[in-house]
Structure formats: structure tokens, C-alpha cells
């Protein structure tokens, strides 16, 4: 492969993480598993630099490790019908994040920094159960975090996770919130439970917890822990050999664990059930779109195109 030209030799904030995922279900049946993966932690302002500097990383172009802006949060103001203003605009993840945060009352300036912890495409395939955005002001002050939760139906739902008032951890500030899920993630978890997001700014060590809770009880504990690695061609190859086709491994593990839960007799919920509880979803599945269309028709509202996220109140103001 031809040598990739470098843009500069400035130190990068972007990195990789060699990590371990743990799931421990407490109710209604005990179930436990864990496995190793690797993730990318990408400074959104360094994506083009990484594309130029690395042989095995590409932005919006085919490569072994590939980041596509369109795999993540769509711009809420550009996801409707094409018009003169947006028909030629390419997806831009930072612009999309700024627009969504603005709807939540949070201003992310152009010179503010964002780290995105995510699974990139590996050999062209991607599946992300959850990605995390860590937003920092240009001054270095922590602003907020966003959890972008995906599911096997291709939907996305972002959750705003505010700065936690507790003292900073060893690697930086933490973020936490307990918020109603109102989203179909697993067929074995009700829609009306809450997510308890406990996020630590990625540093030398990675520690994230996302638990399912209901009426003060933990139903499912999930942790993501790991160690920081440099983002270099050599490290990309090493981790790719140690965790081959990791994105395929993740989606395969999801279906395998679902089979095990079904065999254990854990109650199962269809996605078409409770569509009224699936709120604030981007790229909504047809089951939600059809339910919304029927509701709109019955109400004779005639408003909205249905191409953006389905309506949802600010989760920060919902009672859990």
C-alpha cells in the first residue's frame, strides 16, 4: 500500500481502547457474560487528520478501520425532505451533535472539543450497541456527555448525560443521570425501565457503567472497562488480530445471548408492542412510523413529515 501523506506531527487526542464488556442480569433470571473488544476514541476535529496520517483508517471511505459520519446521529434539521439548503450537504457528525444539543438547551461551540467513544466499521461492517460523546469547552472545562444507543433495527436514540456533581475521577470529570429508557433495546427488558448512565471521561483507563433500573432495583448491570492504546497503524493491526472482526463478534454475541435468555424462559417483548413508549428515536422502524401515522391520522393533525425523530419530551423532565 502506498505511503499516506501526513498533515502534521502534532500529538493526537484520539486513541484506541482495549476493553472488556460485562453484562450481569439480576431479574427475572440471573444471566452473566463478558467478552473482550477494542474501540476507537476519536476527537471529532481530528477525523480528517487521522484519515491522512494512517494507512488503515479512513473517514467516509473504504478502509480496514472506517468512520462514517452517517453511521451516527443524523442532523435533526437535515433529516427531512431535501431542499435547496440541505440537498448538497454531506453528513457531518459534529454539526449534527451541535444541532441536537441545541434542541436540549446546550450550546456546543465550533471550537469546543468532542471525544467519541465508538466501534468503527471493521472491513465495512458496523454495529454499535452504544457510543458515547464527551464534550469539553475550548477552555478545557467539561460540558456534558451524550449516550447514543443503537439497536438491531437500525434505530438510534441519544440521551443527554449532564456533568455529575461528585468529585472528579482519576482521569477527569464524570457524568451521570437516571432517565426513562422509552426505547426498544432488548426484547427481554420492558420499555418503561430507566437507564442509569455512569460515565467517566476516557483517560489512561476506561470505566463506564450503564444499568437498567426499575423502582430503585437494578435489573441489569453493564460495564465497559479498558486501557488506552495509541491510535497507530501498528496498534490497529495488533488489536484487529487479537479481536478479529470485532463488530461482527458484537452482533453475533447479541443474538447468541438472546437465544440463551429465551431458553431460560425470560419474558419476551415484541417491538410492535408499546410503540407509544418508543420516543425520541431517530431512523424509526416502520412499526413506530406506522403507529405515529395512524395516531396523526386519527387526530387529523396533518403536521410533521415523520422523517426526523418521533416526538419526545425532554427526558430530563420526566419522572422515573
Q: Which positions does each model-derived feature cover?
A:
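Mature, function-bearing regions of proteins
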Residues: 2-291, 308-320
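Long, low-complexity Q/N-rich tracts
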Residues: 291-304
Amino acid at each position: 500500500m502506498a505511503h499516506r501523506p501526513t498533515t502534521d506531527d502534532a500529538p493526537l487526542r484520539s486513541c484506541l481502547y482495549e476493553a472488556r464488556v460485562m453484562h450481569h442480569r439480576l431479574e427475572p433470571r440471573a444471566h452473566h457474560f463478558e467478552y473482550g473488544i477494542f474501540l476507537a476514541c476519536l476527537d471529532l476535529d481530528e477525523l480528517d487528520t487521522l484519515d491522512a496520517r494512517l494507512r488503515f483508517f479512513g473517514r467516509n471511505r473504504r478502509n480496514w478501520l472506517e468512520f462514517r459520519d452517517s453511521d451516527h446521529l443524523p442532523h435533526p434539521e437535515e433529516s427531512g425532505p431535501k431542499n435547496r439548503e440541505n440537498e448538497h450537504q454531506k453528513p457531518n457528525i459534529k454539526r449534527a451533535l451541535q444541532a441536537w444539543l441545541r434542541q436540549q438547551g446546550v450550546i456546543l461551540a465550533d471550537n469546543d472539543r468532542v471525544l467519541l467513544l465508538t466501534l468503527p466499521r471493521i472491513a465495512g461492517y458496523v454495529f454499535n450497541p452504544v457510543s458515547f460523546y464527551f464534550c469539553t469547552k475550548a477552555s478545557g472545562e467539561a460540558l456534558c456527555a451524550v449516550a447514543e444507543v443503537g439497536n438491531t433495527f437500525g434505530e438510534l436514540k441519544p440521551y443527554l448525560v449532564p456533568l455529575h456533581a461528585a468529585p472528579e475521577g482519576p482521569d477527569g470529570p464524570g457524568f451521570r443521570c437516571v432517565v426513562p429508557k422509552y426505547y426498544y433495546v432488548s426484547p427481554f427488558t420492558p420499555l418503561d425501565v430507566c437507564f442509569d448512565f455512569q460515565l467517566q471521561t476516557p483517560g489512561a483507563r476506561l470505566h463506564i457503567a450503564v444499568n437498567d433500573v426499575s423502582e430503585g432495583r437494578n435489573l441489569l448491570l453493564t460495564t465497559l472497562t479498558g486501557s488506552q492504546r495509541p491510535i497507530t497503524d501498528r496498534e490497529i493491526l495488533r488489536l484487529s488480530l487479537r479481536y478479529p472482526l470485532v463488530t461482527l463478534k458484537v452482533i453475533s454475541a447479541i443474538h447468541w445471548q438472546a437465544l440463551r435468555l429465551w431458553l431460560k424462559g425470560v419474558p419476551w417483548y415484541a417491538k410492535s408492542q408499546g410503540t407509544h413508549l418508543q420516543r425520541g428515536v431517530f431512523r424509526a422502524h416502520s412499526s413506530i412510523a406506522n403507529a405515529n401515522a395512524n395516531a396523526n391520522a386519527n387526530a387529523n393533525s396533518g403536521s410533521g413529515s415523520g422523517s426526523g425523530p418521533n416526538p419526545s419530551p425532554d427526558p430530563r423532565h420526566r419522572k422515573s
